[in-house]
Amino acid sequence: MPSSSPQQPLIRSRDAALDLIKWLALLTMLIDHLRHAWPALYFLYVPGRLAFPLFCLAIAANVARPTVGNAGGLSVRYLGWLLLFSLISEWPYRLLVSNAESLNVMPTLVLGLLIANAAQRSDIQVRWLGAGALAVAVLAHEWLMFGAFGALLPAAFLLALRGPRALWLLPMVCCLAANYWAPFYVDAARGDPFAWSVLGMCLFAPLLGLLLLRLRPPFAVPPVRRWAYLFYPAHFLVLAALRSL
């Protein structure tokens, strides 16, 4: 992604704004999952809608970063970590969410990374790999957390990063579709404030992330490194243990 474009945020080798987005994603994910340990905290579902789109934005920013990978796109090591923790995280995820109807979020992020990378690069092999990931996302829609639209969200963010601000609508609409659940729309039609809060947060989350990525935080932001991969399955285990006390 050319750093000279006035329509695109500058993605540096160690971007404090990107680290801030990752911290916010981790924090809101933890806040969201507290409701699985303590059901009375169900209202935390609303701020929890921030987490997934922020993770997807982080993926898009990494794909867009010119120094990632051999040709400015997919890092095999990055993909490998996501694949590894997709497997590691499934049992802790189901330990906390025993009635889960989907896989943990990591497989969706893996597919999203492959699709976004195909949108970034012109290599025929990469394009075929992205097409295969898209086909898997469509076929496995019912088993993926956030479904096929969730797998498309990193690519939608990538287009928003590369294009004019009018394209910011793409990740906003995609995020809303990824969080689609018919009862919310029924409740929203009845004027239920909780349902409207959820739908509003789904539209707000991508906008917040894109705005944050363009800012330079006036304070030091600790880098988010590989420990974050371990945090995902570990926080499931900790919450499951706390629930059993």
Feature map (PLM): residue ranges:
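Alpha-helical transmembrane segments and their immediate juxtamembrane cytosolic regions
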Residues: 1-245
